């Protein structure tokens, strides 16, 4: 009887020990998995997804050339996240458009990685906005008008004067930037940014092995205000064919891009007052790169010459704060650097915010284009935008 009791007790003890061991192993496995999960989240953050859509209606009132149309201006999808907490990545794609022309096709517009450990010295590499002008890096909805100013479009890489494909102000390269001289409130007084780029726009390798150097610096004397300048030294190149009199030649040709901008801005939650003057020295190709065959056309646009400039002054002011805003813009561009080529657009309109993510922008434009036989005409635009 005693032997049976002893054996039963021993069996019970062994069973308890085995259960305890299994529990310990299970707890250790759970702790190990938890450590793995924590470790993974420390390395790569959960991606954040966002985007925006812009649709518009445009009517042009021009003698014998009236037109009106609905269109989808932009649909952009964005993914951002952190790696090792100090690196931020960004991927942005444009999903609307066609597949036949470079400037209107679905494409990757941003793909970059930026080291953000020190606000005084940040490093970005990949495809991203050129550091040139205040308006270029702005979200198109935040600009407050149906498009960037003419001079920004032509001299900051949107529909660039050189004939470069439409690149939304972007290029491939590396950039350093930083904010310096913090005041007693912690607001920095000086910002700098400078980068080295291919000079070919988005999704293109370098041609001609000459890089563009672009940079800017500004001071912020009071909150919301910045005053600064930008410079751009580089070129745009093509490899293909051109005619020199009666002789057809082949090889690589380039046009220079020597540009500077003088910029000033005041901005808060409702107010925007911004003005920029931009000057260009450097020629242009005869064709704009919309297709692969255009990239092989190396004929120069002799008529356009090698000088251009422009200026704009824009104001967006609150009528009802956070809800209703009035706006106006003076927008001058001289594609050949002369008044005979000048195109001036006077804009005025109203923007209404249904909420922070939904906005309707309306404007009327009076255009004076001296390159046309009949200089004057007008346009009306309604733009509807959604952020998500």
Tell what function each PLM region has:
Residues 1-54:
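N-terminal periplasmic/intermembrane-space "pro-region" immediately following the signal or transit peptide
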Residues 4-6, 37-38, 78, 278, ...:
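Residue-level detector of intrinsically disordered/flexible regions characterized by low predicted structural confidence
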Residues 15-16, 88, 288:
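Hydrophobic alpha-helical membrane context
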Residues 16, 21-24, 107, 209, ...:
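Intrinsic disorder/low-complexity signature
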Residues 23-27, 61-65, 84, 103, ...:
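Outer-membrane beta-barrel pore domains
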Residues 36-199, 207-214, 218-227, 312-318, ...:
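Outer membrane beta-barrel
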């Amino acid at each position: 009887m005693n032997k049976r009791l002893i054996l039963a007790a021993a069996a019970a003890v062994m069973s308890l020990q085995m259960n305890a061991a299994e529990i310990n192993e299970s707890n250790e496995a759970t702790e190990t998995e938890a450590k793995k999960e924590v470790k993974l989240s420390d390395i790569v953050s959960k991606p954040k997804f966002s985007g925006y859509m812009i649709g518009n209606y445009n009517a042009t009132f021009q003698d014998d050339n009236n037109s009106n149309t609905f269109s989808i201006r932009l649909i952009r999808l964005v993914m951002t996240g952190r790696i090792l907490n100090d690196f931020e990545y960004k991927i942005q794609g444009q999903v609307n458009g066609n597949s036949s022309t470079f400037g209107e096709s679905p494409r990757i517009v941003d793909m970059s990685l930026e080291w953000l450990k020190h606000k005084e010295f940040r490093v970005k590499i990949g495809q991203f906005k050129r550091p040139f002008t205040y308006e270029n890096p702005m979200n198109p909805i935040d600009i407050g008008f149906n498009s960037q100013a003419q001079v920004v479009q032509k001299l900051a890489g949107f529909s660039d004067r050189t004939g470069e494909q439409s690149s939304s102000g972007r290029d491939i390269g590396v950039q350093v930037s930083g904010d310096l001289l913090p005041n007693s409130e912690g607001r920095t007084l000086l910002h700098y940014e400078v980068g080295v780029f291919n000079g070919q726009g988005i999704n293109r390798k370098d041609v001609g092995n000459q890089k563009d150097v672009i940079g800017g610096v500004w001071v912020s004397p009071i909150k919301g205000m910045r005053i600064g300048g930008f410079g751009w030294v580089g070129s745009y190149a093509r490899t293909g064919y051109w005619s020199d009199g009666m002789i057809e030649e082949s090889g690589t040709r380039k046009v220079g891009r020597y540009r500077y901008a003088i910029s000033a801005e005041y901005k808060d939650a409702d107010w925007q007052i911004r003005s920029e003057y931009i000057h260009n020295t450097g020629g242009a190709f005869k064709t704009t790169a919309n297709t692969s065959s255009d990239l092989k056309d190396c004929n120069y646009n002799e008529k356009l010459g090698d000088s251009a400039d422009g200026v704009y002054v824009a104001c967006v002011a609150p009528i009802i704060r956070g809800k209703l805003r009035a706006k106006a813009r003076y927008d001058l561009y001289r594609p050949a650097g002369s008044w005979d080529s000048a195109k001036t657009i006077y804009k005025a309109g109203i923007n209404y915010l249904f909420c922070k993510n939904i906005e309707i922008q309306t404007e009327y434009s009076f255009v004076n284009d001296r390159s046309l036989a009949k200089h004057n005409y007008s346009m009306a635009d309604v733009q509807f935008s959604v952020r998500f």
